[in-house]
């Protein structure tokens, strides 16, 4: 689906143009054009990216091919950016969808394979307020994109706190707890993998060495970079807490295993006197004085009970029970 918006002197003057009208507007130096490709078909991709804007083949290839990491490329006439936005339409705890941007002096082209809340919010905002250029539009999009990471962070923090409580609980299901720990660890690893390169992309825009970003917008991009830096620091902190919880779980599991081994060892030690006495009198010798004694059975039972009792007292003092 193709959405298009035309701005003149900061005001929205037209939207959802036909293909030929898009070509004319793109060639008009006095107008600002934003084209949003939302889940486009192959034909729409070719018509817009190649037909209207004539983007570099490598940029188009990077756009249509999913990329796991954010990046930015300068193609002289425009900047090409790969970013990742939170995908709220999926059921995963943390999932992202790629949002690609082509930023020129008088145009902005966005491309995404799934509906994005950040794009929808930006569209609603520009229809109600004044848009002042492609760089301002790009900042608005990226600002909403970064803001949408906060609900994910809050959800992951809540899951982390719940896991920390379950790790210390005595009756927690071990296999389920391990699966949850590994799942949340994967979410945090994914988040850190995305946030750091995305911060580098924004940092390059905030430096002031790009002709596509006006100086008056640099403080806004620097603020965006700082927000991503705080997001990264928070993700690192949560990841460290998660690894600490994982270490506590492993130590707890090892302790519980040792307690089980300790109990079995104590049980073996308690039965050892009976085994020794039974083995002694079970030897196949013809001449054993105790075998002829009328009280031999009682002696053997008494010796067994006394040895067992002494073993129990000893293990009690060692706190094996």
Regions found by a protein language model. Give the residues of each.
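Peripheral, non-transmembrane regulatory/ligand-interaction domains of membrane transport proteins
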Residues: 1-216, 220-223, 227-237, 290-292, ...
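Hydrophobic alpha-helical transmembrane segments and their immediately adjacent juxtamembrane loops
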Residues: 226-321
């Amino acid at each position: 689906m193709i959405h298009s918006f035309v701005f003149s002197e900061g005001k929205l003057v037209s939207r959802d143009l036909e293909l030929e009208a898009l070509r004319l507007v793109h060639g008009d130096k006095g107008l600002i054009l934003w084209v949003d490709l939302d889940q486009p078909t192959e034909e729409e991709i070719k018509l817009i990216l190649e037909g209207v804007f004539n983007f570099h083949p490598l940029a188009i290839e990077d756009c249509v091919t999913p990329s796991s990491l954010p990046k930015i490329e300068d193609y002289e006439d425009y900047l090409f950016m790969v970013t990742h936005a939170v995908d709220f339409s999926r059921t995963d705890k943390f999932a992202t969808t790629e949002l690609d941007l082509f930023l020129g002096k008088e145009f902005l082209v966005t491309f995404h394979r799934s509906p994005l809340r950040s794009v929808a919010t930006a569209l609603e905002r520009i229809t109600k307020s004044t848009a002042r250029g492609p760089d301002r539009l790009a900042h608005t999009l990226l600002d909403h994109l970064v803001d949408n990471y906060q609900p994910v962070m809050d959800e992951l923090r809540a899951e982390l706190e719940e896991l920390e409580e379950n790790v210390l609980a005595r009756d927690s299901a071990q296999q389920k707890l391990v699966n949850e720990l590994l799942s949340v660890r994967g979410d945090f690893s994914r988040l850190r993998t995305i946030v750091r390169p995305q911060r580098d992309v924004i940092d390059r825009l905030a430096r002031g060495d790009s002709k596509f970003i006006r100086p008056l917008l640099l403080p806004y991009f620097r603020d965006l970079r700082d927000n991503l830096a705080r997001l990264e620091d928070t993700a690192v902190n949560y990841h460290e807490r998660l690894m600490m919880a994982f270490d506590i779980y492993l130590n707890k599991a090892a302790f519980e295993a040792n307690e089980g081994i300790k109990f079995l060892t104590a049980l073996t030690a308690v039965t050892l006197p009976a085994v020794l006495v039974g083995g002694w009198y079970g030897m196949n010798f013809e001449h054993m004085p105790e075998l002829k004694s009328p009280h031999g059975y009682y002696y053997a039972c008494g010796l067994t009970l006394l040895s067992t009792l002494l073993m129990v007292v000893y293990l009690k003092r060692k706190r094996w029970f």
